[in-house]
């Protein structure tokens, strides 16, 4: 029976490359001369450092630009609040989201059931497995989900016959 998984996961290798490119651009830009602006990564947590709020916004813009060039959807980023760290310096923690959340998984299952397409959807941890008898039905479900779920980037993998 054909099936596929609906997942939401960023390519962490591309995220790391974008961070390295961002740090390189920040170190060479004239408006960051003599400042301690940088982006650090620990697992799925990015920390943005800057001298003030304005430069933090500039660092964020550089990072978003580099992520977009490397085809990483910026909807994966979850911004924390801006924290003061000694003097005028500020930092912001950005988390890279992974997996389909429980609410989104329920929404996907409801969308699939309401579509009246002859497929079954089940929640499997941080993914949603969609199973059907025809490959065409599965492809129409993929098209429907791409159209209806816009707040979170979705990937479709493990497409099996």
UniProtKB/Swiss-Prot annotation:
One of its GO terms (molecular function) is nucleotide binding. NCBIfam families: PRK05412.1 (NF003819). HAMAP family: YajQ (MF_00632). It comes from the Bacteria. GO terms for cellular component: cytosol. Nucleotide-binding protein. Pfam families: DUF520. Belongs to the YajQ family. Keywords: Nucleotide-binding. This is Nucleotide-binding protein BamMC406_2474. InterPro entries: DUF520, UPF0234_N, YajQ-like_sf.
């Amino acid at each position: 029976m054909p099936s596929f998984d609906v997942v939401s996961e960023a390519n962490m290798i591309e995220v790391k490359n974008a961070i390295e490119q961002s740090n390189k651009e920040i170190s060479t830009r004239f408006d960051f001369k003599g400042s301690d602006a940088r982006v650090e990564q620990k697992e799925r947590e990015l920390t943005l450092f800057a001298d003030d709020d304005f430069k933090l916004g500039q660092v964020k813009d550089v990072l978003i630009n580099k992520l977009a060039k490397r085809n990483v959807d910026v909807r994966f980023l979850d911004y924390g609040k801006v924290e003061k760290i000694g003097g005028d310096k500020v930092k912001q923690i950005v988390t890279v989201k992974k997996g389909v959340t429980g609410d989104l998984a329920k929404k996907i299952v409801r969308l699939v059931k309401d579509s009246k397409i002859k497929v079954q959807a089940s929640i499997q941890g941080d993914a949603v497995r969609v199973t059907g008898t025809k490959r065409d039905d599965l492809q129409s479900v993929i098209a429907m989900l791409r159209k209806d779920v816009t707040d979170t980037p979705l990937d479709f993998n493990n497409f099996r016959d």
